[in-house]
Curated annotation (Swiss-Prot):
This is Biotin synthase. Catalyzes the conversion of dethiobiotin (DTB) to biotin by the insertion of a sulfur atom into dethiobiotin via a radical-based mechanism. Belongs to the radical SAM superfamily. Biotin synthase family. Binds 1 [4Fe-4S] cluster. The cluster is coordinated with 3 cysteines and an exchangeable S-adenosyl-L-methionine. Binds 1 [2Fe-2S] cluster. The cluster is coordinated with 3 cysteines and 1 arginine. NCBIfam families: bioB. The gene is bioB. Its cofactor is [4Fe-4S] cluster; [2Fe-2S] cluster. InterPro entries: Aldolase_TIM, BATS_dom, Biotin_synth/BioAB, Biotin_synthase, Elp3/MiaA/NifB-like_rSAM, rSAM. Homodimer. It catalyses: (4R,5S)-dethiobiotin + (sulfur carrier)-SH + 2 reduced [2Fe-2S]-[ferredoxin] + 2 S-adenosyl-L-methionine = (sulfur carrier)-H + biotin + 2 5'-deoxyadenosine + 2 L-methionine + 2 oxidized [2Fe-2S]-[ferredoxin]. PANTHER family: BIOTIN SYNTHASE, BIOTIN SYNTHASE, MITOCHONDRIAL. [2Fe-2S] cluster binds at residues 114, 145, 205, 277. Residues 55-282 form the Radical SAM core domain.
Amino acid sequence: MTQAQTAAVQPAAIPVAAPASQRWRVADVVALFELPFNDLMFRAQQVHREHFDANAVQLSTLLSIKTGGCEEDCGYCSQSSHHDTGLKAEKLMDVDTVLDAARAAKANGASRFCMGAAWRNPKERHMPALTEMVRGVKELGLETCMTLGMLEDEQAQQLADAGLDYYNHNLDTSPEFYGQVISTRTYQDRLDTLDRVRDAGINVCCGGIIGMGESRRERAGLISQLANLNPYPESVPINNLVAIEGTPLEGTAPLDPFEFVRTIAVARITMPKAVVRLSAGREQLDDAMQAMCFLAGANSMFYGDQLLTTSNPQTQRDRALFERLGIRASQADALSDNA
């Protein structure tokens, strides 16, 4: 190959990663989004292989431990009491029911068990049951994650003392677009909860939702916010909007799936050591697009038939896709029929 030919196949001269002292400016993130698709994928795969096994994917299962009746008005959410989605509010599950679900998740190959409650914030009366759930799930040999809304300092510490591994609290979108989706909780409220989680010594799981009508620059704004958290999240879930009937975002035009893949790739480049997770809306991606996401640097996914109140690809389909791609679960034998 001649020198000119070699130069022609090299990606454009945009930094693969920001130096430790440099913040990811929105303009820099936009520049990544605007790379030719093949160049962006090449870059993301380079970064991914520097830090992870390129053919291993971590499996998580998500259980709604308290469904519906949430006080918040998040425009995408079927669990908001502000929206008429036909979802009936339920009480907090009892501990034994949660542990039974965790056992089933482990038997199906999950290595992390995530518990979600539709609350603005947990009440003190809920904390004993929540901490018991954490301890019980950890005793089963699973990593634990919870998403319960905003936390006070003492609540974060109680969860940490129980051994909680991760706390999920998404930023959802960029600061500029946020007000078009949510009015009952501020962006700063979310950042404050993340600070409390960090201060308690719990790993942070924080990502967002794309396809809510935001622009590419606003998607870049979300990634910039996440990448500039100090430190950036250990776990970054990327959700593809599920436009649920009865919510304000019902009827939102679907996002171009290549834009979703680009978002995964940009997240990988800007947060090289984070676990990047395919989350809600994965069923809207065909097998080829999911394979593209793994190539772009996604190395975790929610595994199971339901995510809170939205469906998820069936486990058998996931097993078949992994086999076709030569991907294995990061937990040994996690996809075997007898796992």
